[in-house]
């Protein structure tokens, strides 16, 4: 696995696979930032703007959906996906 980007742009929808994906590897920092923001009680619109690079005032539905799916994926990574990382990463 190569080092993930520190502030990558995101897709409109996070993966929903039952295994770690290349996208997940590329967005590890994004996932950790989302989990940190949730733990800190940050407002979702601020997180969408800063972490996901989507303006929730201009694109509210897109921003909310991207936020929800990426946060769900971040939680999946913390609970399950990390095991795939320990085994060597995404299946190529």
Residue locations for each model-derived region?
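Short, charged amphipathic recognition helices of the HTH superfamily
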Residues: 40-50
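Short, amphipathic alpha-helical "recognition" segments used to contact nucleic acids or chromatin
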Residues: 24-40
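Bacterial C-terminal helix-turn-helix
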Residues: 14-16, 70, 85, 89
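A detector for short, charged/polar N-terminal pre-domain segments
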Residues: 18-24
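Short helix/strand-capping connector loops at secondary-structure junctions
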Residues: 13, 50-62
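Intrinsically disordered, low-complexity basic tails/linkers immediately adjacent to helix-turn-helix/homeobox/MYB/SANT
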Residues: 76-92
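Basic, low-complexity segments
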Residues: 1-18, 91
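Major-groove recognition helix of helix-turn-helix-like DNA-binding domains
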Residues: 33-34, 57-80
């Amino acid at each position: 696995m190569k080092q993930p980007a520190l502030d990558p742009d995101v897709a409109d929808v996070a993966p929903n696979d039952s295994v770690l994906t290349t996208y997940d590897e590329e967005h590890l920092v994004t996932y950790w930032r989302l989990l940190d923001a949730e733990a800190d009680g940050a407002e979702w619109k601020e997180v969408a703007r800063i972490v996901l690079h989507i303006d929730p005032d201009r694109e509210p539905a897109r921003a909310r959906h991207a936020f929800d799916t990426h946060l769900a994926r971040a939680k999946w990574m913390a609970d399950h996906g990390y095991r795939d990382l320990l085994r060597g990463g995404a299946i190529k």
